[in-house]
Amino acid sequence: MEIKATDYHQNNGIYSFTIQDKTINGITGINQLDIEEIVLLKHKYKGSITINNQELKKEDINQYKQLISVIKEQIDKRYYSYKVYECMYEELKRKKIDIKDPKKKIIDSLTAVDLDISYLNRNIRDLSSSEKKLIQLSLAFLFNPELIIIEEFINKFDLKTEKYIMLLLERLIENYGKTIIVISNNTDFLYQYTSHTIITKNQEVLVEGKTSEVLQRVDFLKRNGIKIPEKVEWTYIAKKEKQVKIDYHKDIRDMIKDIYKHV
């Protein structure tokens, strides 16, 4: 799902941006939540929204909203006393989703994120942080969304779990054609895993584009108070202090090899 906002008025700001289709989009900056609210159409608006190059009409707004799932930073605490199956079944009831075989739908949603059906009988409160996050992904899949919005969560995981979850998201894009938005203040994470990045400041989009290009603009990021990804900063320092031509890398091993080769 490609989403384009043009001259969209939100919280006294005016925003224009594009959420790219079938990829991981990163959103960061002071007004990052404004972008989420725009995508979710939380307020009446002035401006233009197009979905897959078709202008969104008033009569289509409810249908559009049905195509989006939001994964909050934490699983809803009211479900902590529930078993996984009860939690997922309750979500189907709450959103009034009419499905002939809800158990099959729940199992399919679990297996889509590589969880065994034995999880259905486990209590939510007994799950690890990474297991809870996978359950949240599974909950999102219950409604077959075209767009999944993931709010800040990655700081809770070790590197191995972080990589596993992001590989899973990439597979969901490849196999199911999903579009994903990750909202995060962690530019190291965005640099490593996203393809398209939007940075907000002063109630507008400061810059957007290919992540590797946007987050390598070190001087620009510094001027605007945006945290520079560590891998970018290390390479930038080596380039500037040693006056050598080395490339920016996402893989730490490639970066170290390049620095040692030239410095």
List the model feature ranges, each with a label.
Residues L190-Q192:
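A short, surface-exposed alpha-helical micro-motif characterized by mixed small hydrophobic
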Residues E204-I228:
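Conserved beta-strand-loop-alpha-helix hinge in the C-terminal portion
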Residues L221-V263:
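ABC ATPase nucleotide-binding domains
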Residues I183-N185:
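H-loop/switch region of ABC-family ATPase nucleotide-binding domains
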Residues G47-L56, Q63-K65:
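Conserved ABC transporter NBD signature motif
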Residues D101-Y119:
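Conserved ABC ATPase "signature" region
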Residues Q74, Y80-K95:
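Q-loop/switch helix immediately C-terminal to the Walker
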